Amino acid sequence: DPDSHSPTLRNYHKFLWSKKLPNGLPFKLDETIPMRLHHKSDLGEFVLSSDSIAHTYSNIKSTTNIIKEIDTKELKKFVSLCSTIGGYIIFPSERINNQMTINGARGVNKKIRDRFDLTLECIRRYYIKEDSPLNETFERYKQFFNLFESFQGYVDFFLLQDLVTNDYSSIRYFIPFETFENYPLPNDIEEYKQYK
């Protein structure tokens, strides 16, 4: 969790996401739990931490050869962009029933591989009660997702409008997506450039 090592990032998140929820109630975050953000009210208690929206995939065996073909300056620029405040989001960070967190599940799921656009597709499906590779995980965290009331509420709260169509009915994928059966990472240099 990047913010566990960066008080600055944690403070930015606290500032950005301490605001009214879609139902008009305040969602005030504090730092009463070390290295985490925290909210406690009649809405429930949530311990939250950040997760990256974009990744270079430079440490993934299947993309190593592709990344070798990317100009070093271009890759550094992408890393820098991924490291801005817009490159992170918060999720609940406490395990429920000793199961994976959202952050962990989206990272290890071979159909998602930490791609945020695919995670957002899973979130969209969750709100309209369609199955997805992360549905079981999201069900454990339904109290968190209930805060936002709908997919549009979630997107608007976290300022993710650039990643969805104007009517919120579909995702603007980083690379083409048809089904979760397809390999989720870029297959060649052209797809990688499109992804970044």
Kindly give the residue locations of the regions a language model identified.
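Intrinsically disordered, low-complexity acidic Ser/Thr-rich regulatory segments
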Residues: 42-84, 145-152, 158, 164-168, ...
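C-terminal, well-folded lobe of enzymatic/effector domains
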Residues: 100-196
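Intrinsically disordered, low-complexity N-proximal targeting/linker segments that flank membranes
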Residues: 1-70
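Hydrophobic, well-ordered secondary-structure elements that form the walls
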Residues: 92
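Residues immediately within or flanking Cys/His clusters that coordinate Zn2+
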Residues: 86-89
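Context-gated lysine
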Residues: 14, 19-20, 28, 40, ...
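Short, glycine-/Ser/Thr-/acidic-enriched flexible segments
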Residues: 95-98
